[in-house]
Amino acid sequence: RKIALRKRPKTGLLAGLWEYPNVEGALDETAAGAAVEAMGLSVIDWQSRLTAKHIFTHVEWRMTGYALTVRGDGPAELEWVDAAGLAARSVPSAFARYYEEAKRELEMK
């Protein structure tokens, strides 16, 4: 089992940290599936849908995350990591709920 991460840009909010692949906007499952396919991945299975909110001093993020099983490697910017790889990367606390879920999934055998 592996999970996809990508490094955020070197400038801006959460610069240089790691994040889960994402797109801006409110997406339902159909739109989320289309976004995944636009990355060159095929959705095999949908496992879960998690919502989260993170408040920065100047902006509020409301997020919906989908846990998927996919086929393909996707764009070169994606790095597929196991549990040790996830633990070795700096993922912002804004994604804490998703980090814990990813960690739990990766540690399951």
Regions found by a protein language model. Name each.
Residues R1-K109:
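Intrinsically disordered, low-complexity, charged terminal extensions of DNA damage-control enzymes
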